[in-house]
Amino acid sequence: LQTYLATFPNIDGYMEKTIADARQCGYVSTLFGRRRALPELNSNNHNIRASGERMARNTPIQGTAADVIKLAMVRVWRRLRDEKMESRLILTVHDELIVEAPEAEAEKAAQILREEMEGCVQYAVPLSTDVHAGKNWLEAH
């Protein structure tokens, strides 16, 4: 952690400001505006307060990632439907979208996954995606 904070010196200040802002207004938000209330930040119990601080630090990042994967999921589903493909979006695992595709569609399905996942939001730093295929989930990893 110390090496990480030394490499990215502004993160510590950002985290402290995020906690202070959350304590003042009672919530944190994702980049898409989804709010998470954090009454734990005002607890007299140290453990509960520390838990609230962890949630305040993590929610803007992990919550935004959850928002992004949901947007990508909708975009992939629509593309598969609009292109009348047999491929189906069947599962999400954290930041993964799992698509079941006939072999004849595997390459096109992979292209759609990459395009829609990388193109669903525009940030200063582009999102990149790894796409893997296999006969089963284990083989694809």
PLM regions: where:
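Conserved catalytic core of nucleotide polymerization and phosphodiester-bond processing enzymes
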Residues: 1-141
